């Protein structure tokens, strides 16, 4: 059974910036865009777009995602104790928008397969990498829960050139420079 979320016992409210100012500050930080997925008790897939994801530790391999405490996906994820983080590729804006919108069936027309470690949904398209995780810890922080996942499976997809980014409330693509070794091979082949 996954751990119950702990809560930060601090009263931080006095003297803080307002929410809009905070979002403007954080919007200046470019982030990757992920879709966090899990399965509900009935085996139904759940997922949401998440830009608050990052690595925590190499040994053991841990990552974290931050999810709104009112989210149905968070509830399913904590009950299941397993989830996947699907890192979207440049051009994956429509997938990000689908999983960010309040629609009934976010997985309609989305290609995915059961992950190798726990069967949670791993997206088959629009991703540069994925990580399958077991919930290691959860901490309520304000209106979100920080979920720490122990990475049990996953990997990059080297054939996909660049990730999707989010900056100042807009999508962007990471600029990809051509690998000089590949460029030399291409020039040699073209001769």
Swiss-Prot record:
Checking Pfam families in the record gives: Flavin_Reduct
Q: Keywords assigned by UniProt? A: FAD, Flavoprotein, NAD, Oxidoreductase
Record's keyword annotation contains Oxidoreductase: yes
Annotated residues that bind NAD(+) are located at 55, 144, 166-169
Out of the domains of life, which is the source?
Bacteria
InterPro entries in the cross-refs:
Flavin_Rdtase-like_dom, NADH-dep_flavin_reductase, Split_barrel_FMN-bd
Which EC numbers does the record give?
Answer: 1.5.1.36
Q: Which amino acid positions bind FAD, per UniProt?
A: 46-52, 72-73
Q: Which Gene3D superfamilies match?
A: Electron Transport, Fmn-binding Protein, Chain A
Its UniProt entry gives the catalysed reaction(s) as: a reduced flavin + NAD(+) = an oxidized flavin + NADH + 2 H(+)
Q: Which family does it belong to?
A: Belongs to the non-flavoprotein flavin reductase family.
Q: What does this protein do?
A: Catalyzes the reduction of flavin by NADH. Subsequently, the reduced flavins is transferred to the tetracycline 7-halogenase CtcP.
Name of the protein in question:
Flavin reductase (NADH)
Q: Which organism is it from?
A: Kitasatospora aureofaciens (Streptomyces aureofaciens)
Taxonomy of origin reads: Bacteria, Bacillati, Actinomycetota, Actinomycetes, Kitasatosporales
